[in-house]
Amino acid sequence: YNGATWSGSGWTGQPLMMKWPKKVKKAMNMYDWAKEKDDLVEVIYACMDGYVYFLDLETGEATRDTLNLGFTFKGSGALDPRGYPILYVGAGYDSNQGTARVFVVNLLDCSVMYTFGNNDPFSLRGALSYFDSSPLVDADTDTLIYPGENGILYLIRLNTQYDQEAGTLSINPDHIVKWHYYGNRTSVASYWLGMEDSAAVYGGYLFVTDNGGNLMCLDLNTLQLVWAQDTLDDSNSTPVLSIEDDHLYLYVSTSFRLGWRSSSSAEVPIWKIDAQNGRIIWKTSYECYSDDGVSGGVQSTIALGKKKLSDYIYVTVAKTGAQYDGVLACLDKKTGEVKWEHKAYYAWSSPVCVYNSDGSGKVLYCSCGGKAYLLDGKSGKLLDENEISSGAIEASPAIYNNYMVVGTRDCRICGLKLE
């Protein structure tokens, strides 16, 4: 559309997975065999061809007809955390059906219950209305929390009515609250308003980065900005929350958009931030390159180690060392010291930690060179690699038990079994 071609699964492009209760499946438009399969885990994947795909995690077989929404979906969307059969997914580009928007989909029959965000006069970016973020739902208040690249944070009370026994579902959105902001260095040419990452929320406070190089803490009850920290550049990395010694910290990074800070290369820090006041605890930096339209730095979300990996964080850094090179870096949470690096083709994909029953862990990530890598989380030793695509893998993998699923730019959805 409009001279742009979008193929396969893009950034962030993480599939969603759900093991629906049998009573819920009974009311769904699934194929009969899928309804009857007791251990079915359904993969729900919105892709850049405008379709949402529904697949059996174990086999890749379609569990129901594809849903054609007619817009490019780069982001991952979200399922309702209450177990309600609702999909929230935002379009990442306009189409011949109009400007991009958010869809709220009833997964009982795949009907669209509600759309919003397109041509919003409250936007400070005109008609631009892209949504790459994954939203959150506050169960206590039945409120959808959705950041947009149009610079608006949407808070929408859904008034959800779901009767599992009857197999009925409806929403009646009202009390729609919108928040937007101005950036001191924002212009038409650079440091744009807008949020492409996803928000993190803790105790009534929302943390989000933006295209304008800001990490913001917002009080959701007053919609007052508590603090802002300079992240230097177009930031697409979702802040990751970590409680350490009864104190809340954030791990986050940024990218390098060519021409904003430099026409060649620029520093890309990885930060540990005090969530209470925005103070920088430590930073570890990489020098990164960019192509026009293909940014280096950190496009991914940092993986927080748990269990026997609880001392570490893992982050993919793109276009460092050389234009097409990158690293998966393991950093010490307390100091920011680099413990090890795995060097390969650069990656936009977020790493995922997986654990054995004894608490030992491995790290899995995918590269824009088409490979998936599995490494020991402590030593960084390469345990396995698999070239699963002849094109790039920009999307982030999702893992359920010992199955991994990821989409590729060459129009494949791949399932791998981890052993």
Residue ranges and their predicted role:
Residues 1-11, 16-89, 93-131, 136-419:
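Extracytoplasmic/lumenal domain signature
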